[in-house]
From Swiss-Prot:
Segments traversing the membrane: 3-23, 36-56, 78-98, 101-121
GO molecular function, one term: carbohydrate derivative transmembrane transporter activity
Residue numbers on the Cytoplasmic membrane side: 1-2, 57-77, 122-128
Periplasmic face of the membrane: 24-35, 99-100
Organism of this sequence: Shigella dysenteriae serotype 1 (strain Sd197)
SUPFAM superfamilies referenced in this protein's UniProt entry, alphabetically: Multidrug resistance efflux transporter EmrE (SSF103481)
Protein name, entry field: Probable 4-amino-4-deoxy-L-arabinose-phosphoundecaprenol flippase subunit ArnF
Length: 128
């Protein structure tokens, strides 16, 4: 059950990260404070996506809280690295995100996935 909550947290945090990235690229820069505030108050699509991202992070924290009650911290914390993998893949697959493929990033993803496999694969008991 803890693993399920952890995966929910990772997926929701990844979607929230993508939402915040989209909003940040479409909202006026914070250096133009009045334009930024006016855009937020107009509550257009960009502002709603920003709010969705923030609420997603809040929901992700709730799932993380539930994860920590059911799963050892050493395993739970390792799950967070999956968010990097999901965001990287989504930025390349989703249209308009402009994510780029590189061997360096692929190597990083391979390291993350290898580490997760080492942590989560069951161990065999040795008899002495």
């Amino acid at each position: 059950m803890g693993l399920m909550w952890g995966l929910f947290s990772v997926i929701i945090a990844s979607v929230a990260q993508l939402s915040l990235g989209f909003a940040a690229s479409h909202l006026p820069p914070m250096t133009h404070l009045w334009d930024f505030i006016a855009t937020l108050l107009a509550f257009g699509l960009d502002a709603r996506i920003l709010l969705l991202g923030l609420l997603g992070y809040l929901l992700s924290v709730f799932c993380w809280y539930k994860t920590l009650h059911k799963l050892a911290l050493s395993k739970a914390y390792a799950l967070l690295s999956m968010s990097y993998v999901l965001v990287w893949i989504a930025s390349m697959v989703l249209p308009g995100w402009g994510g780029t493929f590189s061997l360096k990033a692929l190597l990083g993803v391979a390291c993350i996935m290898s580490g997760l496999m080492l942590i989560f694969l069951p161990t065999t008991k040795q008899r002495y």
